[in-house]
C-alpha cells in the first residue's frame, strides 16, 4: 500500500501548500511564475484564497501604472529643484531621488511654485524701490502698504541749535546722530501719541544753507490736530518769521482790541474783548457833548467826510441848480 501511495499518483491528493495572496515585498511576476509552476492538483482551482491569472494581471497593471506615475513625478521634481542642486554644487546622480507618493509630490511642487513667486515679487520690489525716493513700502502681515513721506523747510536763525520745528503737534525726541554728508546732527522725534500714532519726524539743518531747517515726516497722524498753545506758531503760518496775534490796549478806560495778523493778504481782524467795560456816566457824557470843543470837532469831522466823498460835490451842484429860478 505504501508503494501504491508513492507511485500510483503524481502527488498527494491533499495539497499542504497554503497560498493567501501576494507578499508586498515579492515581485508580482515571480509570484505568478510560482503559481504556474505548481502542480495542477495543488493550485486549488475552486478555492477563493488562491490567486488566479486574471487577478495577477490586474495587480501587475496597477504596479506598472504606479511606477509610471512615480517616474513622471520624479521628472517634475528634478526640473523644479535642478537649479538649486546646480547652485549648491551637488550631483543628482550620486543620490537618486526616493520614490514619493502622488500626494506628497503635488504638495512639494505647489510649495516650490509659491516660493518662486515670492522670490520674484521680492526682487521686483527691491528694483522699484531704487527709483522711487518720495514713497517707501513696508510689509505688514503679508500685505504691502504705502507710507507717506513729506518734507517741510523752515527759515530759522543760524545761531539757533535747538532743531525744533513747531507744527502744532507734540513730539518726543528719542535720538540724535551725525550723518556723513552733513556736519549738522540729525534729530529724531516720535509723535507724543505713540505707539498708537506711527508718525516719525527727522529734523536737520540743510548742508547748503545753515539757516534752513529741513523736517521729514514719515506716516500720517491718526488723531485730530491739537489746538495750538499760546505763543506757538500755527501749523499753516507762511513766511520766514511768521506772525503772532497781539493785544493792544488803547487806554485804561477803553476796551481791549485784539489784532489778528495771521490772516492771508495782510487782512487785520479786530476782535473785541469778551468782557465789555462798564458803561460811562451819563452826566459826564452830556457835559462833553454840550462843550464847544466837542461841537467844533464834530463839525470839522463832518466837513472832512463830506468833502472827501466825490459824489457829494455832484449831488450838491444838482440840488443848487434845482433851487435856482429859471432865466
From Swiss-Prot:
Compositionally biased residues, Polar residues: 114-126
InterPro entries named in the record: WRKY_dom, WRKY_dom_sf, WRKY_plant
DNA-binding region: 160-226
Keyword flag Transcription: yes
SMART domains: WRKY
Family classification: Belongs to the WRKY group II-a family.
Domain remark text: The WRKY domain is required to bind DNA.
Name the record gives this protein: WRKY transcription factor WRKY76
Species for this entry: Oryza sativa subsp. indica (Rice)
Upper lineage: Eukaryota, Viridiplantae, Streptophyta, Embryophyta, Tracheophyta
